[in-house]
């Protein structure tokens, strides 16, 4: 068990990083939120935002947003 656990953690970390990198390839690069409006227009009830260096389409799931 002590020798297998570090291997499992390393493999899981590598898989997460590979998936995250693959998923990010489809994202639109941006420098401000206005560049993301067209990218997010295919979704309904979302707020376009430039987070980091790529567009995110944030969905409000109820509640009060200030």
From Swiss-Prot:
Protein localization: Secreted
Keywords: Disulfide bond, Ion channel impairing toxin, Neurotoxin, Potassium channel impairing toxin, Secreted, Signal, Toxin, Voltage-gated potassium channel impairing toxin
Tissue: Expressed by the venom gland.
GO MF term set: potassium channel regulator activity; toxin activity
Disulfide bond entries: 30-50, 36-55, 40-57
Domain notes: Has the structural arrangement of an alpha-helix connected to antiparallel beta-sheets by disulfide bonds (CS-alpha/beta).
Any coiled-coil regions, as ranges: none
Similarity comment: family membership: Belongs to the short scorpion toxin superfamily. Potassium channel inhibitor family. Alpha-KTx 30 subfamily.
Recorded GO CC terms: extracellular region
Protein species of origin: Scorpiops jendeki
Source superkingdom: Eukaryota
SUPFAM superfamilies found in the cross-reference section: Scorpion toxin-like
Span of the signal peptide: 1-24
Function: inhibits Kv1.3/KCNA3 channel.
Record's protein name: Potassium channel toxin alpha-KTx 30.2
Additional information: Negative results: does not block Kv7.1/KCNQ1 channels.
Chief location bin: secreted
InterPro entries in UniProt: Scorpion_toxin-like_sf
């Amino acid at each position: 068990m002590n020798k297998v656990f570090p291997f499992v953690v390393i493999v899981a970390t590598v898989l997460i990083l590979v998936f995250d990198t693959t998923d990010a390839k489809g994202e639109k690069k941006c420098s401000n939120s206005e560049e993301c409006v067209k990218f997010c227009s295919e979704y309904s009830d979302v707020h376009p935002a430039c987070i980091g260096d790529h567009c995110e389409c944030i969905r409000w799931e109820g509640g009060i947003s200030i």
